[in-house]
Structure formats: structure tokens, C-alpha cells
Amino acid sequence: LASADIADGEKVAKKCVACHNFEEGAGSKVGPDLYDVVMRKKASVDFSYSAAFQALDGEWDYDALNHFLYAPTDYAPGTKMSFRGVRKDEDRANLIAYLRTLSTNPAPLP
């Protein structure tokens, strides 16, 4: 992640804007708001989560984000999210690095 390209991550994130907001205070759309998602407790923002997401424990740490973004329906069977995933390792790393910047206090890199 330290060498990830944040600008490329922002480009990858454009696939997500139809369903997710990225700005502080913007609120949820079809999917939950992704501002400050890194290290946030799963299923913790104001959103109508599926039972699959409500059952998830822990935080959206780097490992959890990586696994979820690779194959959302494998990570959370029964999720309402229809996106098939970001299969390229580099694209996922870039996207996660970009998501990390969407915070007033970005989480430390692993």
C-alpha cells in the first residue's frame, strides 16, 4: 500500500460513485457512505444494511477491505451489493490507498 497510486485509486473509485458517496457528511446512497471507511466498524453508518453485513464483526481494516473488494459476495454471502469485485491486486491496492485519504485523520499504513 505504501507504493500504491492514489490518483489511480480515485479512477477505480469512479466505478463506485453510482452507489456510494465519498465526501464527508454526504450520507448514504444505494450503498453506505465510504468517507472515513478505513478502520471504521463494519455496518456502523446510517444505512439499511443486509443481514449479511449486519452479521459482520470487526473493522474495515486493510485486510478486510482487500478481501471484500476482491469478491464482495464471497466475503459477505447474501449481500445486496451487486458489484462483482476488483480482481486486479494493483487496482485494489490503489483503491484502498485512495479510500484511506478520505478522512480527516487517515489510518496508519500497515
Show where each model-derived region lies:
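N-terminal post-signal-peptidase region of extra-cytosolic proteins
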Residues: L1-A2, A18-N21, S48-Y49
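Gly/Gly-Pro-rich "capping" loops immediately C-terminal to redox-active cysteine motifs
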Residues: I6-E10, E24-Y62, K80-G85
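The canonical Cys-X-X-Cys-His
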Residues: A13-F22, L95-L99
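Short phosphate-engaging motifs
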Residues: A18, A26, D91
